[in-house]
Amino acid sequence: MKTIGLAILILIAMSGCQTKSTKTSLSEQRAFDLGNGAQPIVISPSTLVVDARSAFDYSTAHVPRSIPINWADYVEAEPAQHGIIQNDTYSAARRMARAGISPDSQIVVVGSGLQGNGEEGRVAWMLAYLGVANVQFSSIDALKPRLTNEPESQPPKSADIWKPVINESLNATRDEVLFAINKNAFISPVSYKGGPTRLYKFIDVRSERAYLGKEGIAAIKHVPNMEAINIPWKQFFNSALRPNDATLKQLRAMGYTPEQRIIVINDDGVSSAAVTMALRAYGFNRAANYSGGLQDLIP
């Protein structure tokens, strides 16, 4: 199996000293260049920082005025559908509005980076799916000079209630995945539900051991053949959890194109969501996350 190396660590030089409880103001605009191939992260007075980590990690250190959001609070209730984004998208949008998020918000989602499971990418994907256009994500370590452990005294004001404009192309359903498998759509292009005829490509972003059936769901259940290539999700990112140029350029060299329907898959639709957003950032505009993951495909 081919292994695609991780990007070289990119050092981020920032001014200011770090203390246990830094009170850095958001009154100034600050750009964080976190790697080639991705737009710099910009923190300005209008930026909303969303924190995708656990409540404990948030209480320990967070960006001032950031909004904690757990991706698992926005999924279907059935255990086998744990990764599927909730069907009641209006309810999800109302909760976002109460947290201060609107479709026009400039969002930066932060999380545990390569030490986590791509939760910041999953939250960013969810926001984009609901119609929030300007959303990026990175590791919170990239913003360390801004962190504080003080409780929030002035949380963001609620936004007006808004209607979600669903970007359905970001999400692959069980029905679409099974259709592609049954029609051998990874060999010959097909039309799904009357849409344009497209060739399907599957990228499995689980670990190599999980992909080979030595651990995880594939160790106890049969995974149907979808001619998926295996690239563990962390190889799509650099140390700041920004898209890794080398991996994404190699996909193009392997014949992956923006015209193809690329479906990213793992067990639960979390790290696969992060990879989907990285693919979109590099012009693979029909890339989709199978949010249900293998636990939905083979319950």
Regions found by a protein language model. Give the residues of each.
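Thiolate-centered catalytic microenvironments shared by cysteine-dependent enzyme domains
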Residues: 24, 86-186, 271-293
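Active-site neighborhoods of enzymes that stabilize oxyanions during catalysis
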Residues: 32-35, 77, 143-226
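Helix-loop module immediately N-terminal to the HCX5R catalytic loop
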Residues: 76-107, 231-262
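C-terminal soluble interaction/assembly domains
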Residues: 242, 247-250, 259-287, 291-299
